[in-house]
Amino acid sequence: MEQSIFPEGYESALNLHDTQIAIKTVKDFFQKHLAQNLNLARVSAPLFVLPESGLNDNLNGVERPVTFDIKNQADREAEIVHSLAKWKRYALKKYGFSVGEGLYTDMSAIRRDEIVDNVHSIYVDQWDWEKIISREDRNMETLKDTVRTVYKVLRKTEKYLSIHYDYIQEILPGDIFFVTTSELEEMFPDYTPKEREYYIAKAKGAVCIMQIGGRLGNGEPHDGRAPDYDDWALNADIIVYYPVLDIALELSSMGIRVDRKALLEQLEAAGCPERAELPFHKAVIDETVPFTIGGGIGQSRICMFFLRKAHIGEVQCSLWPDDVMEEAKKSGLQLL
């Protein structure tokens, strides 16, 4: 999406007060069952990190983090996190987790360069989770099994809400459809990556698109991915069709994390081999951090989806352009 959409005739089924109650209902139920099914413990997480640590998520490599100096630390500069993709792997070691165990956090981030629309905001809130796996488990089956587990929790949450709210009907299919970006390119060669996502999501209802970041047959990647956390051969997005807006809606991005080989190859491909000298990257290369799988699940995204809202601003507090605020008001959307 490149601009906000205000569906004709849309009216929220819940007022502002009831929306707040419903948001808590969604979050409490989902995170409880996610933690149980993936064997995750909740931990405290940082809002900011030091740039020189290499722990921040560089996203596509062009987004600017919000930075500030710290007065009583000789004006040392810190930056607000974009996500905790790399920090979590470091934390699993520091906190003494074992193979088969994992952690999750309530992650808040500011992405100042985000192009905002119905599903994108400069404020990002997600469950960031990470789990230790063995070297032998770094394979496609582990990825798919974990995707199925996350998807099962999504379906269970939708069923729970459909019982509590009469207006919510179950729309998620029984199974999620798996496809790689290369297969998707073969299926829809004349379409853009976003168009491919839309058509496959609308056809299947729920889709797991795998292997994101590397170049496809046309010489371009399906989508941008930082080279230093996901293994581009072993990652995935969970995308569902969202009829309220007639869009493909990404609910989660996840993947098996880079090992030494994947990290060095991807840093080279991304044109930033110098990052290998950063502390986190050295730890991956030296294998002093565990092998892991992890991801992020958008809290506002799933609240928007399950509560059938037309704009993410209906379920989170953020700042929006004046024209969006004006159009929302005219359309009867109540942005928080």
What are these regions (language model features)?
Residues 105-195:
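Extended, charged alpha-beta segments that form solvent-exposed binding/catalytic grooves
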Residues 47-51, 166-173, 321-325:
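A glycine-rich phosphate-binding loop feature that marks nucleotide/adenosyl-phosphate handling sites
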Residues 2-120, 128-132:
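Class II aminoacyl-tRNA synthetase-like tRNA-binding/catalytic domains
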Residues 108-110, 180-336:
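A translation/RNA-centric and nucleic-acid-associated enzymatic feature enriched
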Residues 68-71, 93-99, 119-121, 169, ...:
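A general structural signal for short secondary-structure junctions and capping/turn motifs
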Residues 21, 25, 29, 138-145, ...:
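Generic recognition of stable, solvent-exposed alpha-helical segments in well-folded globular domains
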Residues 34-41, 150-161, 310:
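A generic secondary-structure signal for well-formed alpha-helical elements
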Residues 101-103, 124-128, 204-206, 246-248:
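Extracellular structured ligand-interaction cores
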